[in-house]
Amino acid sequence: MSSVTIERIETCLVDLPTIRPHKLSVATMYGQTLMLVKVYCTDGAVGIGEGTTIAGMAYGPESPEAMKLAIDAYFAPALVGKDATRIQTLMAHLGKLVKINHFAKSALETALLDAHGKRLGVAVSELLGGRRRERLPVAWTLASGDTSRDIAEAEQMIEVRRHNVFKLKIGAKELKTDIKHVAEIKRVVGEHAAVRVDVNMAWSETQAAWAIPALADAGCELVEQPVASAAALARLMRRFPVALMADEILQGPDNAFEIARVNGADVFAIKIEQSGGLFAAQRVAAIADAAGIELYGGTMLEGAFSTVASAHLFASFANLQWGTELFGPLLITEEILTKPLDYSDYQLTVPDGPGLGIELDEEKVRRFTRDGLIKVTKA
């Protein structure tokens, strides 16, 4: 056993405004809450992890508040005093102690990896096998709910060379209205940008079978999670000249294997939180590669810490055919890092410093911490 142990664990909720309302088929977001967790080790290393969700509990069973409670009440007491360098052993222990709670586990695993990378003087990507790329292509989601506003937003992104791939949130309106929305945006951006859509499970199989060919005719190249059922998604496969991507139904390696077994998607949206952490997401990607399923780096609209953790993982992938959507920090009005991330030329630069390679602006975070409360668990 290493002499380096976990000394204490702190959690807090940070409520941050967004640049505009973000409209999905399931809900509309007016801000984002980050659950931040800090792991303090006896050698002085401090790791930071983050948990977020999309629109509170509208997307899934966990919320930032639930993550914080799970860590404070169950995970932190089980980790304090344990060997901080045996990350996979610790995560296996937590997996036996508490079922599911993938988002909370991902936040803790990120913090442990951040601390270990700082301890060893290497980037998290090196702890995951080594990066294959320094920069990642990043798509932007158009989700204002208004066609003209989305077009203006897309044109601005193209002009400043920040994004040239756009994912449109649809599914909340009538099918013909949504398809007209997609077609109009693609008509304006033309060959300057690619257009994809995310339905967030809003359609029935019958609706999807009608809408997907129309989306293909409109110039859409990928449809994300059009239906809620894995079986329905599998039945839709290979019927249309558009790639179909699994997202919400991907809840870790077990789900990934079952979807791959029935050839249930063209593309997997890899998300560290939804998978249960970076190592679990790595296994999801390995299953996809073995099955010939292509990869896309997804987001839970995370802040900087989960975004960068995801970037370190995605940078290590052999295949990343559909790029990423790691734009979460750009949706938030407040910069919580001492040095902003580098988004330029349609890509994100993966930080190369020890650990995650980023530093929290403590004063900024204190201003937005809910009720000024920070929970500390120590021996």
Curated annotation (Swiss-Prot):
SUPFAM superfamilies: Enolase C-terminal domain-like (SSF51604), Enolase N-terminal domain-like (SSF54826). The active site is at 169. Its EC number is 5.5.1.1. It catalyses: (S)-muconolactone = cis,cis-muconate + H(+). Mn(2+) binds at residues 198, 224, 247. PROSITE patterns: MR_MLE_1, MR_MLE_2. It is an enzyme of class 5 (isomerase). Its cofactor is Mn(2+). GO terms for biological process: amino acid catabolic process; beta-ketoadipate pathway. Catalyzes a syn cycloisomerization. Belongs to the mandelate racemase/muconate lactonizing enzyme family. Homooctamer. This is Muconate cycloisomerase 1-1. The gene is catB1.
